[in-house]
């Protein structure tokens, strides 16, 4: 399981850079980043090397941030590998709310995704031979 930080940002210029600068100044390294937006606000989702420091720093800088648990997978870097795992989830009535990838090693990609039933997702993926991170 992976713990992500979700940060709500006002949908205007400079918000993402201000958030990232606060983290930089605190010495927090970002492993992955995803931004989703609506007309009024954006959600910056990050994976860091130190969530405790990141959350404390963000809150002190008046950013609305929370920690969210995700399923993390290491997926072979080959055609169809992710598709096969998504089919397993679908066949077990597990919905993926959102997903993003980040750098992997040794010929593997890393995937993080949110679902309503983390334990069920992990269980069915492990039975299918997936490597949970």
Predicted regions and their residues:
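A conserved regulatory-domain signal marking ACT and ACT-like small-molecule sensing domains
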Residues: 1-133
């Amino acid at each position: 399981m992976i713990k992500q930080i979700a940060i709500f940002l006002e949908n205007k210029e400079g918000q993402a850079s201000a958030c990232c600068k606060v983290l930089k100044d605190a010495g927090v390294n970002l492993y992955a980043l995803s931004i989703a937006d609506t007309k009024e606000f954006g959600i910056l989702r990050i994976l860091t090397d130190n969530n405790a420091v990141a959350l404390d720093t963000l809150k002190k800088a008046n950013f609305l941030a929370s920690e969210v648990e995700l399923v993390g997978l290491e997926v072979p870097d080959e055609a169809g590998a992710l598709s096969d795992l998504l089919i397993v989830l679908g066949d077990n009535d597990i919905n993926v709310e959102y997903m993003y990838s980040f750098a992997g090693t040794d010929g593997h990609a890393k995937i993080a995704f949110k679902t309503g039933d983390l334990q069920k997702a992990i269980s069915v993926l492990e039975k299918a031979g997936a490597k949970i991170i």
